[in-house]
């Protein structure tokens, strides 16, 4: 099992950013002002409240503690650079970041720990998608997870190496 001490500061920041990146990808895939606040809350709840994954409990637990500490200290979390970029470019950059995290986990972690961490990231993406309702009018005809969000989650899963 790996711990925070096994990672450089840059690597650790990549790991901290990964669940946020996955959540933002889902939110951007089918962005609606009315659902964005719920999805942001869902992303935070997904990071902090979902069960710790088997095999990666220590690593994810340490990461959650860092996220909580930054939040309590009102430290600004890194945001993807979106200035002057079209949404497709931003999404491609985010997938690249998640691919880098997947490679880092595969390189440094035992397989069960890497898989557990990746599944936790997917759990954050799923919780984000399920937190808002998409489409419809005043909630009528809306769906919990849109097709665009499902497509984004599929790309995330493939990039993390969880599905082909």
Task: Annotate the PLM regions.
Residues 1-164:
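Small-residue-enriched hydrophobic alpha-helices in membranes
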């Amino acid at each position: 099992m790996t711990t925070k001490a096994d990672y450089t500061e840059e690597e650790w920041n990549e790991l901290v950013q990964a669940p946020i990146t996955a959540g933002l990808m889902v939110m951007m895939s089918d962005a609606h002002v009315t659902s964005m606040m719920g999805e942001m809350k869902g992303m935070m709840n997904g990071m902090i409240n979902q069960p710790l994954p088997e095999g990666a409990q220590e690593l994810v637990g340490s990461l959650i503690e860092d996220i909580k500490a930054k939040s309590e200290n009102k430290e600004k979390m890194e945001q993807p650079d979106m200035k002057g970029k079209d949404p497709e470019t931003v999404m491609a950059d985010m997938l690249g970041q998640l691919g880098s995290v997947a490679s880092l986990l595969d390189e440094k972690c035992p397989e069960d720990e890497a898989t557990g961490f990746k599944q936790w990231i997917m759990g954050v993406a799923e919780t984000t998608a399920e937190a808002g309702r998409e489409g419809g009018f005043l909630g009528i005809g809306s769906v919990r997870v849109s097709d665009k969000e499902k497509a984004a989650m599929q790309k995330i899963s493939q990039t993390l190496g969880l599905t082909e």
